[in-house]
């Protein structure tokens, strides 16, 4: 049996913490009654060892063991840097 490590892509919404950031993961779900597609957002705390990300960057993250009370994801790579 193989365990696949979950990886997601999202946008950095906060990088004010030391070695940490908040990433917003956006998904589209269908409303159960009306059938309209709605955007839903989940915010995750992510470990950024080298402080290489800034607000607006698109990043790839993967799940890991719990690093703190709220942080159990780590940065894999920066997919796209934000244009400021």
From Swiss-Prot:
Q: Gene3D superfamilies from the xrefs? A: Nucleic acid-binding proteins
Query: One biological-process term from Gene Ontology?
Result: translation
- Tell me if Ribonucleoprotein is a UniProt keyword of this record: yes
The reply to whether Metal-binding figures as a keyword in the UniProt entry is no
UniProt keywords, alphabetically? Ribonucleoprotein, Ribosomal protein, RNA-binding, rRNA-binding
Q: Which domain of life is it from?
A: Bacteria
Subunit structure, interactors included: Part of the 30S ribosomal subunit.
Its biological purpose: One of the primary rRNA binding proteins, it binds specifically to the 5'-end of 16S ribosomal RNA.
Describe the family membership recorded for this protein in Swiss-Prot or TrEMBL.
Answer: Belongs to the universal ribosomal protein uS17 family.
* Record-given protein name: Small ribosomal subunit protein uS17
The record lists the organism as Yersinia pestis
Gene assigned in the entry = rpsQ
């Amino acid at each position: 049996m193989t365990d696949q490590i979950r990886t997601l892509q999202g946008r950095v919404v906060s990088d004010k913490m030391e070695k940490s950031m908040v990433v917003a993961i956006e998904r589209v779900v269908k409303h159960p009654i009306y059938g309209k597609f709605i955007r839903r957002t989940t915010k995750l705390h992510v470990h950024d060892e080298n402080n290489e990300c800034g607000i607006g960057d698109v990043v790839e993250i993967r799940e890991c063991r719990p690093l703190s009370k709220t942080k159990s994801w780590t940065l894999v790579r920066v997919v796209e840097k934000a244009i400021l």
